[in-house]
Amino acid sequence: MKIITWNINGWRAIWQKGLPHFVERYQPDLLGLQEIKINNELATAWSDKLPGYNIFWHGAWRPGYGGTAIIAKQNLTNLRVTNGLGNDLFDREGRCQISELPDFYWLNIYFPNAGHELERLDYKQSFNKYLRQFVAN
């Protein structure tokens, strides 16, 4: 199984720069994208643009910010994708998607940045602590 992860810093920009060609060339089974910067409402227009793949979106609550997406081969019929960790503080920013397959779980995560002035350090530490507890259970 080929799994690729990529912080794209914006869905529209990476699409125009050749995401379809990248997917065609490397043919990942799972492609995890972080920082998609598109909300779920806008994302649905893109959902059928990659033949042979399904796209699972987890956009942030505000457009132009954060979010994750999983692009999965359609032949992965036993794939289950869950958006979020069950904590609205983190889930509203679209930070985590959980892929469940018969043999393993795979987390597509966009980790928080503490910021230049460390203004979001507490948030980042809270996220990391919550994620560790989530994975341990």
Residue ranges and their predicted role:
Residues 11-14, 38-41, 117:
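Active-site environment of divalent metal-dependent phosphoester hydrolases
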Residues 12-25:
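Short, acidic/polar
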Residues 121-137:
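A long, amphipathic alpha-helix that forms part
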Residues 36-114:
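Structured beta-strand-rich core segments of catalytic domains in phosphoester-bond hydrolases
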Residues 3-7, 23-41, 106, 135-137:
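Active-site beta-strand/loop signature of hydrolases that rely on acidic residues for catalysis
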Residues 6-13, 85, 123-125:
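Short, flexible loop segments at the rims of nucleotide/cofactor-binding pockets, characterized by
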Residues 114-120:
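Metal-dependent phosphoester/phosphodiester hydrolase catalytic core
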